[in-house]
Amino acid sequence: MVTSVKVRAPSSTANLGPGFDVFGLALDAFHDEITLTKKPWRGVRILTADDIPKDPQQNTAGLVIKSMKQKFKIKSGIEMRIKKGVPAGFGMGSSAASAAAAALACNRLFNLKLDNKSLVKCAGIGEKASAGTIHYDNVAASLLGGFVVVKTKPFDVIRLEPPKDLVLCVAIPKLKVPKKKTKVSRAVIPKTVKLSDLTENLSNAANIVSGFLLKDSDLIGRSIQDVIVEPARKHLIPGFSRVKNNALNAGALGVTISGAGPSVIAFCKKSQNVKKVAKSMEKGFSSAKIDCETIICKPSIGPKIRV
């Protein structure tokens, strides 16, 4: 009988420009690790050396486990060890990686036999702890790997395999980010938009999906354009415009804010000089007197489970 399960789930980037709350892409840059162990008592206990809430109600992964315990009438106590590898608050899907790993581990530990859609819905509940609302783009990417498209009414999630030549460069500025940063960054998004802006974003979003279907990195890159959310959020990231322009001038196919920011992500191909793109992004942040770390990574195939 299985008494303990360990899951390692990848970081992710959401939105990809025009796909706000709809698109997600798993990245092999960072990982979170969750270990669930059955215990004789009834509650949920979190053990971690990281600076995150230990109250399950305030913790992304804890919220997922509490919800699944209630929904599936799990009587066993659960000890959860959390090892954070995804930097929190930088638009890399940190909360989602923990939520995804927790949902997958719980499914395996208690043999729930949930399908992918059900797992994504369970993991999405955890986002309420960090973002204040339930959304599924990052958790779907961390759970399923690859590129994901989320539909909410009715709920559905589609996974597509990324092109093999797609490479990402993520610039992570060394900024002090507020707690509940995702909630703060969502507050600046306009409540109403012009029809022409909506049309432009829809066109770009459709072309991004087409690019993943056709395995065309160039089409994906030139469609990474957002005229609604990015303009509203870019003022929260010092030096963003310079970072973006520098990366494009260095050969990046497309550049946008990674998730809710403040990280900036450039889409490239393996055949390009991606290190040149990375250096150009560092110089962009440097012009705003901001240090940054650049990570060159590729799409992740998804989480790993160990029993």
List each language-model region with its residue ranges.
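Short beta-strand segments
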Residues: R8-P10, A26, S142-L144, K151, ...
